[in-house]
Regions:
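Formylglycine-dependent sulfatase
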Residues: 2, 7-16, 25-445, 449, ...
Length: 500
């Protein structure tokens, strides 16, 4: 046990016996660097290793290479939207346990609490240098900032908004919605910000459409500089790079504008592929690629898939859910199932795939195991340790179920290959006003849930409750186990934008 692990174990034993559990590290091996690259609204069927890429009109050669050198998770499950999925990833908990089960928008009160324990804190406590460059989207209150939750450095968009905020000033000016001079409006609009641990947010420059188009170049440059500094200092690092690849409006950089055959969304996919390659090249140049675990995943399904099914082929940011139904904001398989590739030379077998059910929450305890640090025991941790899946020692993993929430509602459950819906999520409006995805409405089912077999029917076209009603029992058991945890650990108020 090295010095950091010994101090962590002693601290856990002497200071917080009731609040943490130390997971066994991998037999006295050197701690790996960890790089987690998170795409935004990129669908299961968008990239080459999952049936997209060149076939879809946007080649992704560096991502294809990453898959050849690592492990493809083919049943990687997330939450239905940006904020919920990022909250689940960072805390190892269902987003509703932190009141973050709706996408944060400007003016909403949802924000990450002081008591939350994040992945940044896991790594920081294990002696890692930590940084996030890009989109946090878990709140901008001082107690919610990434630098208040274990990250040494942050550079990106405001922590309570998303990439589309680059259009706010333009749309306000166009509609004359505010009686504010343009220059003053620009100064008051969204800003690129930065912070270091213990310090406040500092404004860098306005976040305009022009900045939006080139922002990922900046984020990768910041990431490269961070890794070089930590290599020089001889310190292990955790780099979290939630960049803009896939999120509307997909304004490509000048280098990639017009490169794909499918418009700006494809251009941005190709640009993102280039940036993934830059990160991999930097690791190799630094001589740390064999010592670095790289994860590349998406936060949720794409925008626009349901619009395509309704006959709208003109959405410029329309992604592809592959064989699955649904999109960003729903609880359908196409919303919560997306790609994830893991590479760790010498540890993760190259050119492999796993069908084990793997939740984004599972990275929290899995990373804790790999770096020999602690996970909290004073709260439910919904993630499970999936180290054996990553290392090829288990085909099935430690998970066979998952719940899905939207706002205050538990809307669906997965158990093995079965999906059960407790609410009926449908697009709102009719005709041109028909809005799917995150603008859908939900209504309670009239007594019985909908049930689908995802393996036989990935598009969820055929309800099978009549033939397979027995599956309700195991899924209700999953629900009841979750409800039991609420007796000791009740959830805070869920995100809400419609019920006052």
């Amino acid at each position: 046990m090295n010095r950091h692990m010994m101090l962590g174990a002693l601290s856990c034993a002497l200071v917080a016996v009731a609040t943490c559990t130390v997971l066994p590290a991998m037999a006295q091996e050197k701690k790996p660097n960890v790089v987690f690259i998170l795409a935004d609204n990129v669908g299961y069927g968008d990239l080459g290793p999952y049936g997209g890429g060149e076939l879809r009109g946007a080649a992704t050669p560096r991502i294809d290479q990453l898959a050849r050198e690592g492990l493809r998770l083919t049943q990687y499950l997330v939450e239905p939207g940006c904020t919920p999925s990022r909250a689940a990833l960072m805390t190892g908990q269902y987003s509703i346990r932190n009141g973050l089960s709706l996408i944060i928008v400007p003016g909403s009160k949802s924000t990450l609490s002081t008591s939350a324990v994040t992945m940044g804190e896991l790594f920081k406590g294990a002696g890692y240098a930590t940084a996030i460059f890009g989109k946090w989207h878990l709140g901008a209150e001082p107690q919610s900032l990434p630098t208040a939750h274990g990250f040494d450095e942050f550079y990106g968009i405001p922590p309570d908004i998303s990439w589309d905020s680059a259009t706010y000033v333009d749309t306000i000016t166009l509609t004359h919605s505010m009686n504010v001079p343009p220059d003053e409006l620009l100064a008051k609009g969204p800003q690129i910000v930065e912070a270091v641990a213990g310090g406040p947010l500092r404004t860098v420059k306005p976040f305009t459409r022009e900045v939006r188009a080139e922002i990922d170049d900046e984020l990768v440059a910041k990431s490269t500089d961070f890794m070089k500094r930590q290599k020089a200092a001889g310190k292990p690092f955790f780099l979290y790079l939630p960049f803009s690849m896939g999120h509307f409006p997909n304004l490509p950089s000048k280098q990639f504008a017009g490169k794909s055959r499918i418009g700006q969304y494809g251009d941005k996919l190709m640009e993102g592929d280039h940036h993934v390659g830059q990160i991999l090249d930097t690791l190799k140049e630094l001589g740390v690629d064999d010592d670095t675990l790289v994860v590349f995943a998406s936060d949720n399904g794409p925008q626009g898939e349901t619009s395509r099914e309704m006959g709208n082929q003109g959405t410029p940011d329309m992604g592809n859910s592959g064989p699955f139904r649904g999109e960003l904001g729903e609880a359908t398989e196409g919303s919560i199932r997306t790609f994830c590739i893991v590479r760790w030379p010498g540890k993760v077998k190259p050119g492999t795939s796993s069908y084990a059910m793997f939740s984004t929450m599972d990275f929290f305890p899995t990373f804790a195991r790999l770096i020999g640090t602690k996970v909290p025991t004073d709260r439910p941790i919904d993630g499970v340790d999936q180290t054996d899946v990553l290392l090829g020692k288990s085909e099935t993993g430690n998970r066979d179920s998952l719940l899905s929430f939207i706002g205050a509602d538990m809307v669906a459950a997965r158990w093995k290959q079965w999906r059960m819906y407790f609410t009926d999520v449908q697009p709102t409006g009719i005709g041109p006003q028909r809005q799917p995805g995150m603008f859908s409405s939900s209504a309670p089912m009239a007594g019985y849930p909908k049930i689908y077999n995802i393996e036989m029917d990935p598009h969820e076209d055929l309800q099978v409750a009549t033939l397979f009603g027995w599956t309700v029992g195991p899924m209700i058991e999953v629900v009841e186990k979750y409800k039991e945890t609420l007796e000791q650990y009740p959830n805070p108020p869920a995100g809400n934008l419609t019920k006052f």
